[in-house]
């Protein structure tokens, strides 16, 4: 029996406003617990909310970037939820009149074909606080309570976990590009819940739906969806009755666990928020925001491929965040070597950022300095191997590559006589490798070149080493 997976995603993106959704408290991440609070976001009796216009602007901007229709009449509603991280026992959100509807994101599938994933709606709302569970009990931090969110609800159009991750990557890239959210998953500013069901291939009715929460990375989303797909199939084939429920992904155990039965809309007892006015959004407002939308990621990808001649894969990776795309574009233009700029950013620099938990905007060096390093390598002043050491020093100190090379004595040695002596020395110490070469084992050339580079501490010009090594081997 063949089965088909049906996936829909609910993405919560914290909007990049300076203040909270319904009060003037800072929306900045972090801070000492319960210091970014006031009577409004704490839900104290008599405290009245007022809506953050910038949050509405950002919601509209997200909708336009995702090809949505923007409502002209929007309304805020109360959604009743009884959790300790929401002190007023209701969330101010949108129910019947969301800000944006009927959009789509176009993604590229693994076979190169394009597919449109529908965006059912985008509504704006407030975030909840955080619960910290300890051995002594549960602590509540209300700093995040009231931070503006855009909830982006997809249609159930995805048919594989890989499609879901591709959709998320493109969504993150778009939101980052238009500047409505920084999309930092490790800070909780981009969170995703998944709804999954499994049905027999060709069936017209979806199966029993499961919601999955607590997925803190795109990798976790893919793993959780694959796990649930297998769990549903096993249940169907064994005759087990599935129930609509919410489950939590456990990253340590690589499995989901039950949280609670899945609520329906009527469980939340929605009704209009009487303390806030209706949103009246005219065409002039919408068009003024449309004019601020920059070049979108798919447009930037196409331009990078055409203008800089880089592969499609490179363009896709470099445009995942706009800060990375901007850094690349500046470096490519200044250095005149787009492929080297791409290789450095996707390779060593991304590795350094990952190991040190920093973003590209946190780097101490600039596109101008990276361009200088690329030029020094291309001119033969230093080898690519030395360049890898220089980039680490640039990250640590912010110094220019030229200064680092001079201070560390890293200038490349291109003196053929000196290099030839070292080549002969290496060959005299590795007679077996010479015999292997004579017997057609050409791989030993790389091994021998590596020994020369080791003796010169990476300073020998690799092109000269390669030429001299082959010449000497052929003389043996």
UniProtKB/Swiss-Prot annotation:
<dbReference type="InterPro" id="IPR018027">
    <property type="entry name" value="Asn/Gln_amidotransferase"/>
</dbReference>
<protein>
    <recommendedName>
        <fullName>Aspartyl/glutamyl-tRNA(Asn/Gln) amidotransferase subunit B 1</fullName>
        <ecNumber>6.3.5.-</ecNumber>
    </recommendedName>
</protein>
<dbReference type="InterPro" id="IPR003789">
    <property type="entry name" value="Asn/Gln_tRNA_amidoTrase-B-like"/>
</dbReference>
<comment type="subunit">
    <text>Heterotrimer of A, B and C subunits.</text>
</comment>
<comment type="function">
    <text>Allows the formation of correctly charged Asn-tRNA(Asn) or Gln-tRNA(Gln) through the transamidation of misacylated Asp-tRNA(Asn) or Glu-tRNA(Gln) in organisms which lack either or both of asparaginyl-tRNA or glutaminyl-tRNA synthetases. The reaction takes place in the presence of glutamine and ATP through an activated phospho-Asp-tRNA(Asn) or phospho-Glu-tRNA(Gln).</text>
</comment>
<dbReference type="InterPro" id="IPR042114">
    <property type="entry name" value="GatB_C_1"/>
</dbReference>
<dbReference type="InterPro" id="IPR023168">
    <property type="entry name" value="GatB_Yqey_C_2"/>
</dbReference>
<dbReference type="GO" id="GO:0050567">
    <property type="term" value="F:glutaminyl-tRNA synthase (glutamine-hydrolyzing) activity"/>
</dbReference>
<dbReference type="InterPro" id="IPR004413">
    <property type="entry name" value="GatB"/>
</dbReference>
<dbReference type="Pfam" id="PF02637">
    <property type="entry name" value="GatB_Yqey"/>
</dbReference>
<keyword id="KW-0547">Nucleotide-binding</keyword>
<dbReference type="Pfam" id="PF02934">
    <property type="entry name" value="GatB_N"/>
</dbReference>
<comment type="similarity">
    <text>Belongs to the GatB/GatE family. GatB subfamily.</text>
</comment>
<dbReference type="GO" id="GO:0006412">
    <property type="term" value="P:translation"/>
</dbReference>
<keyword id="KW-0436">Ligase</keyword>
<dbReference type="GO" id="GO:0050566">
    <property type="term" value="F:asparaginyl-tRNA synthase (glutamine-hydrolyzing) activity"/>
</dbReference>
<dbReference type="InterPro" id="IPR017959">
    <property type="entry name" value="Asn/Gln-tRNA_amidoTrfase_suB/E"/>
</dbReference>
<keyword id="KW-0648">Protein biosynthesis</keyword>
<dbReference type="GO" id="GO:0070681">
    <property type="term" value="P:glutaminyl-tRNAGln biosynthesis via transamidation"/>
</dbReference>
<keyword id="KW-0067">ATP-binding</keyword>
<dbReference type="GO" id="GO:0005524">
    <property type="term" value="F:ATP binding"/>
</dbReference>
<dbReference type="InterPro" id="IPR006075">
    <property type="entry name" value="Asn/Gln-tRNA_Trfase_suB/E_cat"/>
</dbReference>
<dbReference type="InterPro" id="IPR017958">
    <property type="entry name" value="Gln-tRNA_amidoTrfase_suB_CS"/>
</dbReference>
<dbReference type="InterPro" id="IPR014746">
    <property type="entry name" value="Gln_synth/guanido_kin_cat_dom"/>
</dbReference>
């Amino acid at each position: 029996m063949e089965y088909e997976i049906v996936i829909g995603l609910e993405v919560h993106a914290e909007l990049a406003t300076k203040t909270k959704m319904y009060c003037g408290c800072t929306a900045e991440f972090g801070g000492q617990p319960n210091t970014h609070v006031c009577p409004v976001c704490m839900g104290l009796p008599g405290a009245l909310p007022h809506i953050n216009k910038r949050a509405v602007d950002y919601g509209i901007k997200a909708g336009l970037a995702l090809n949505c229709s923007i409502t002209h009449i929007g309304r805020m509603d109360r959604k009743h939820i009884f959790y300790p991280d929401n002190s007023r026992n209701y969330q101010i959100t949108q129910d019947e009149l969301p800000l944006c509807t009927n959009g789509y994101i176009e993604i590229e599938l693994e076979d190169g074909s394009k597919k449109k994933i529908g965006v059912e709606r985008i509504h704006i709302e407030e975030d909840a606080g955080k619960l910290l569970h300890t051995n002594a009990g549960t602590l509540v931090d209300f700093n995040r309570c009231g931070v503006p969110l855009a909830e982006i609800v997809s249609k159930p159009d995805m048919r594989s976990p890989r499609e879901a991750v591709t959709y998320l990557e493109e969504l993150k890239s778009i939101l980052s590009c238009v500047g409505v959210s920084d999309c930092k998953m490790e800070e909780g500013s981009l969170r995703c819940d998944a709804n999954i069901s499994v049905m027999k291939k060709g069936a017209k009715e979806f199966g029993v739906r499961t919601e999955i929460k607590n997925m803190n990375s795109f990798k976790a989303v893919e793993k959780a969806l694959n796990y649930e797909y297998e769990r549903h199939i096993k249940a169907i084939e064994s005759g087990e009755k599935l129930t609509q429920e919410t489950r939590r992904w456990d990253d340590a155990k690589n499995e989901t666990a039950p949280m609670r039965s899945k609520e329906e809309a009527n469980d939340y007892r929605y009704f209009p928020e009487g303390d806030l006015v209706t949103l009246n959004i005219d065409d002039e407002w919408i068009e003024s925001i449309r004019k601020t939308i920059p070049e979108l990621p798919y447009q930037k990808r196409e331009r990078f491929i055409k203008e800089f001649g880089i592969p499609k894969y490179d363009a896709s990776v470099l445009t995942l965040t706009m800060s990375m795309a901007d850094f690349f574009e500046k470096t490519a233009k200044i250095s005149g070597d787009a492929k080297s700029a791409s290789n450095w950013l996707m390779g060593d620099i991304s590795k350094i950022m990952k190991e040190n938990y920093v973003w590209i905007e946190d780097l101490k060096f600039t596109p101008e300095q990276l361009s200088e390093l690329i030029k020094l390598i291309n001119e033969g002043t230093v080898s690519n191997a030395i360049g890898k050491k220089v980039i680490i020093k640039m990250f640590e100190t912010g110094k220019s590559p030229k200064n680092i090379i001079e201070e560390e004595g890293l200038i490349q040695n291109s003196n053929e006589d000196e290099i030839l002596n070292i080549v002969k020395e290496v060959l005299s110490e590795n007679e077996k490798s010479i015999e292997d070469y004579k017997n057609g084992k050409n791989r030993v050339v790389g091994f021998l070149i590596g020994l020369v580079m080791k003796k010169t501490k990476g300073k020998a010009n690799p092109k000269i080493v390669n030429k001299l090594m082959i010449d000497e081997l052929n003389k043996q």
